[in-house]
Regions:
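Active-site-proximal alpha-helix that buttresses catalytic centers in soluble enzyme cores
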Residues: 1-332
């Protein structure tokens, strides 16, 4: 019998501010980034982490892998697309270790050509001779929604007690360029509410599923936290590359909420599984300051990080993947 493992795939992040130029070249497939963009991102990294200038993403992802390995009783490897340990290097090591079957799970729950598709390509490029089962997306996994709700519920209660206001929830996911998902830009600044999801779901079948899946995750979490006064959805952290990115942006949505009289907001990202710069800077610093300027108290729940429910969700996905590998072997 061959050796079977789990491979967790993640975005990756540099360990120091000085490594950011190399990291950004990886993100944009070797293209040069304008110097002012590099310097701005270096500035953001300089404001986060312990010590300052350090993103905890790599350590937290490795911890998630270790917890999953303990829960499963099976080896778990972790590979990053844009930084060390690179996916290609990890898969090469797996081959050297005698691995014959791989259950690959992307730590971006919502399926997209800009995440899952690229991670799949990177993993398969070095996996010759292995049996591979790739989890395409798990945006509607109930345990994932349970994990987010477990973090959200106390944050809503705490902000309500602190402000005396009815608390609205703003769910977010990372924006992506419209060209990558064949989606029109949303630029009117209006919050995306649940009815919009049904309209999106009726789009052309070849449209990237990312935006719809992100909103479905949000809806599942919202159902589990009925004590919130209401919720809406926006896309965060739009990049500097040319062309429009999907929206509406968080800033435009917060403006619309303020105009509607909202005073207290808990912002919960549903596409991120651990702390990194888009949480520790974009949300904790930039969005919080922006909201304060609108008269809104904005808070964020604790990230999933080492959540036991997240570990259970990943374990469930891995077991399902192992079953598919068994079925594929039986058919041969």
């Amino acid at each position: 019998m061959g050796k079977r493992v789990v491979l967790l795939l993640a975005h990756g992040t540099p360990n120091t501010v000085d490594e950011i130029p190399e990291y950004l070249r990886n993100v944009v497939s070797g293209r040069a980034m304008p110097q002012h963009v590099v310097e701005e991102i270096q500035h953001r990294y300089s404001l986060i982490g312990e010590p300052k200038g350090h993103s905890p993403l790599t350590e937290l992802t490795m911890e998630q892998g270790a917890k999953l390995a303990k829960r499963l009783g099976e080896p778990v490897y972790v590979g990053m697309r844009n930084w060390r340990p690179y996916i290609a290097d990890v898969v090469k090591q797996m081959r050297a270790d005698g691995v014959t079957e791989m259950a690959a799970i992307c730590l971006a729950p919502q399926n997209s050509r800009t995440s899952v598709g690229l991670y799949r390509r990177a993993a398969l490029a070095e996996a010759a001779g292995m049996q591979v089962d790739f989890t395409e997306g798990w945006s509607e996994e109930p345990l994932l929604a349970d994990a987010f709700a477990e973090r959200l519920r106390p944050a809503v209660a705490a902000l309500a007690a602190e402000t005396g206001e009815r608390v609205q929830v703003l769910f977010t996911a990372h924006s992506v360029p419209c060209r990558t998902i064949q989606a029109p830009a949303v630029s009117d600044g209006q919050p995306i509410l649940w009815p919009t999801l049904k309209q999106d779901a009726e789009g052309a079948p070849n449209v990237d599923p990312y935006a719809v899946e992100a909103k479905r995750t949000a809806a599942m979490v919202a159902e589990r936290v009925p004590e919130a006064a209401g919720w809406c959805f926006a896309f965060q952290s739009q990049g500097a590359s040319g062309g429009p990115w999907i929206g509406p942006a968080v800033e435009a949505t917060l403006e619309a909420m303020a105009q509607g009289g909202v005073k207290a907001v808990v912002l919960q990202p549903v596409g991120f599984l651990c702390d990194h710069v888009e949480i520790l800077y974009d949300i904790d610093i930039a969005f919080r300051e922006f909201a304060a300027g609108l008269g809104i108290e904005l808070r964020r729940p604790e990230s999933l990080n080492s959540s036991a429910l997240l570990t259970e969700a990943l374990a469930k996905l891995a077991r399902e993947s192992f079953l598919r590998l068994d079925e594929a072997t039986a058919r041969r």
